[in-house]
């Protein structure tokens, strides 16, 4: 599609592909090997729909993996999550098991809702990259 590498899908000036089973950090590093490559970001409803359809098309229905990494991560300090209690005090991770700092799309929501999970799990992931020159 639109000069993307074989097997990749074109959308609004970039190329996208689903890959299998890495932790969030491994997946981001893997995506970095392509020009402008990163885990996919979702900035609009139209893009969310494109990504959901891409995953549904590429991830076998028989696959046991029902979650897919996206490029969203809580970058707050390691011992605190980015959420606050209603009185504005911080939530400390020692009370949250496991730490949930990276986000997936889940088959149960037809790959349309963002869900925070432990970054060390291994899931399939979607890379976004510039069109190869």
Swiss-Prot record:
Subunit structure: Heterodimer of subunits alpha and beta; disulfide-linked. Forms an active complex with the pentameric immunoglobuline Mkappa (IgMkappa).
Gene Ontology molecular function, alphabetical: toxin activity
Limits of the C-type lectin domain: 11-128
GO cellular component assignments: extracellular region
The protein, known as: Snaclec echicetin subunit alpha
Family label: Belongs to the snaclec family.
Subcellular location per the Swiss-Prot or TrEMBL entry: Secreted
Annotated S-S bridges: 4-15, 31-127, 102-119
């Amino acid at each position: 599609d639109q000069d993307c590498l074989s097997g990749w899908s074109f959308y609004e000036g970039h190329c996208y592909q689903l890959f299998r089973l890495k932790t969030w950090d491994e997946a981001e590093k893997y995506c970095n090997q392509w020009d402008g490559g990163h885990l996919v970001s979702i900035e609009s409803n139209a893009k969310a729909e494109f990504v959901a359809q891409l995953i549904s098309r590429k991830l076998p229905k028989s696959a046991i993996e029902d979650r897919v990494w996206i490029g969203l991560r809580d970058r707050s300090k390691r011992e605190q999550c980015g959420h606050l209690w209603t009185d504005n005090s911080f939530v400390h991770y020692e009370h949250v098991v496991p730490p949930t700092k990276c986000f997936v799309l889940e088959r149960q929501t037809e790959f349309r809702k963002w869900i925070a999970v432990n970054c060390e799990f291994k899931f399939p992931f979607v890379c976004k990259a510039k069109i190869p020159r």
